[in-house]
Amino acid sequence: MAPRRRRRAARSSRPLLLALLAAAVNNFAPAGGVEVLAKSRLESCARGGSDDGRDRLTCDSKIVVDLAVPSGSASLVARVAEVEENGTEAGEMPIRDPLIITINKSEVYALYDLTYLRDVAYKPEEKFVKTRKCEPEAGANVVKSCERLRDEKGSIIEHTEPVCCPCGPHRRVPSSCGNILDKVAKGKANTAHCLRFPDDWFHVFDIGRRSLWFSIRVQVKKGSSESEVIVGPENRTVVSEDSSLRVNLVGDFAGYTSLPSLENFYLVTPRKGVGGGQLEVLGDDFSRWMLLERVLFTLDGLECNKIGVGYEAFRSQPNFCSSPLDSCLGDQLSKFWEIDKNRVNNSQPPQYVVLGKFERINQYPNAGVHTFSVGIPEVLNTNLMIELSADDIEYVYQRSSGKIISINISSFEALSQVGSARVKTKNIGRLEASYSLTFDCLSGINPVEEQYFIMKPDEKLIRTFDLRSSTDQASNYTCQAILKASDFSELDRKESQFSTTATVLNNGTQIGSSENHTKGGIWGFFEAIKAWCAKMWHMLINFFTGTTCSTRCWSFLKFVIHGLLLVAVLWLLHRKGLFDPLYYWWDGVVGSEAQERARRRHKRAHSHRHSHHHDAHKRHKTELAGHRRHHVLHIHDDDDPVAAAAAAEHVILRRHGRHEAALGVQHRDGLKLNKHRRHGGKAVALLPPGEIIVRDGGGCGGVEHGDRRHHAWH
């Protein structure tokens, strides 16, 4: 009998083994991949402390089935119809109510944590205005759309002033400088350049840790009763309410293809609407969602040719005026979207746009409005252990009581910050035991994984869970922590409430202009005074440092320097005699004529002045002189002709002296008049050889001397 009983004991597990294998192979061969890894019967015993201080060992028998369940909504139905009871000779006995085990596994998703960083412009634009007298502080009447921007408070946004470039064919914008008259009358031509952002913005999210999400539902049906549990990465071990079923998610088998890792990428999604200051629902327009490497971004806006470039980087680029237009605005979002658009039109897969690159985008059932998940196309096997009975293996685990002491959760900003839940637990039993802790929120918070740990008697331990909001709105949440014993039975449960603040949009250094700022009132007056004081202080500093003059006075200094240089060159050429032929020609053309006209004008003026003052006097003197001369001649005519001639000569000489003094007659030969000497009763006048011409201004008479000749005329 003994050998026979040993033979039956050896065969005791075979009917169950065959039943499970038949169910797996016959019912689900088309599903492909559902494999039964191991089956056994084991004696499961638990040792726990009692009130009387003694350890107690409680055992029960269960069936353990270890399965490899693939992804893709795979199912397994096992029907346990026969069992063999140990120690009996009845053999296999049918079960009145066979056990039917049904396993369903959902699609597998890769879920990525998102952290909001800032907003960036889709396509920054460089605007330029051809103008004159461009200055960074110039108003709209000079630089037009490149005028400095102001925020909603009316304050000037830093680094938004235009950059002024001179004219020329090889400048940033080739332009004509015009002629010299335009420069003098209107000012030197130049161009004003500025950076502006149109109203097309994208959210930028940092992609953090990756986690897998799927769910496995296990149902055990016996007659009219049914037990069901659902396990997943966030809740790996579950016991049914009637304790007849225990399912443990052991882990996943690695596949041949690695899962997409996006830690080095940023996710950009279009922003819906303008303004509001709040993130909106991202929607399902995945054709504009893009994954771009982090090195393509500048979050501080201080680098050119990167997404997120700001005003300061645009103005500070080297060789600004000699660089081509848009030299700082390369590699923007618009460029990458256009690249993928052309690839799709050519029947090629996209490189950056998520649509067409991944499957089942954001179809994760518990996805929030700001979550990112993609489907895993590869078949991923999950190791699942189902406990129904035990026989072949005996093992002992220690079970001890425990409780949750406190839960501390601080408020945090939705999407842009990560919350932290600190759960403090304590082992209140007398044995060292293992525990599991789950943290579950009703909605709005991404699920977190269950944690396993060991505590010694009276030991307190704090476990931390990272909380990430799936919405950008401020909200209140209620979550509960569940402490389980080593046999996965629930020991304690505690609820906690916390709140999140709304996500605040941040454009970084790409600040746009606000047209809604208000001015006026007492605050506007104070702001004006503040701005004036700041301007005066700035001007004072620039006066001592020379900063303003180096920028504003440079054009004037260049004009003065060039003018002085031109004058110096012309003076040197003049000293060398280069312009002498020109001088001679000019004198020949206009010099003699000008001198003649000047002489005639001078003569007319001189004659006119003397004619008014001396005409009457001259006429009187002329008549008187003529009368005297006639009287003298008349007196001496009859008595002595020689004396009459001498008297006439004397009268002429007297007139000659007066005219000489009045008209400034110069004697070329030094005229000398000798005294009258009486010789032979005659008066003789001795004159030196020379020529003296004395003419009366009125033309009435004159004296002319020449080579011992004397002429007198009336």
Swiss-Prot record:
Membrane spanning residue stretches: 553-573
Major subcellular site: endoplasmic reticulum
Cellular localization per UniProt: Endoplasmic reticulum membrane; Cell membrane
Topology within the bilayer: Single-pass membrane protein; Single-pass type I membrane protein
The keyword Membrane is annotated on this UniProt entry: yes
InterPro entries in the record: HAP2/GCS1, HAP2/GCS1_dom
Signal peptide: 1-33
Residue ranges that the UniProt entry lists as topological domain Extracellular: 34-552
Cytoplasmic side: 574-714
Cellular component terms (Gene Ontology): endoplasmic reticulum membrane; plasma membrane
Composition bias type Basic residues, residue spans: 598-619
Domain of life: Eukaryota
Entry annotated with the keyword Transmembrane: yes
Cysteine disulfide partners in this protein: 45-59, 134-164, 146-194, 165-321, 167-177, 304-328, 441-479
Family, as annotated: Belongs to the HAP2/GCS1 family.
Function noted in UniProt: Required for male fertility. Plays a role in pollen tube guidance and successful gamete attachment. Essential for the fusion of gametes during double fertilization, where one male gamete fuses with the egg to produce a zygote, and another male gamete fuses with the central cell to produce the endosperm. Mediates the fusion of cell membranes. Not required for pollen tube outgrowth.
Misc: HAP2/GCS1 family members mediate membrane fusion between gametes in a broad range of eukaryotes, ranging from algae and higher plants to protozoans and cnidaria, suggesting they are derived from an ancestral gamete fusogen. They function similar to viral fusogens, by inserting part of their extracellular domain into the lipid bilayer of an adjoining cell.
Protein name: Protein HAPLESS 2-B
Source species of the chain: Oryza sativa subsp. japonica (Rice)
Name of the encoding gene: HAP2B
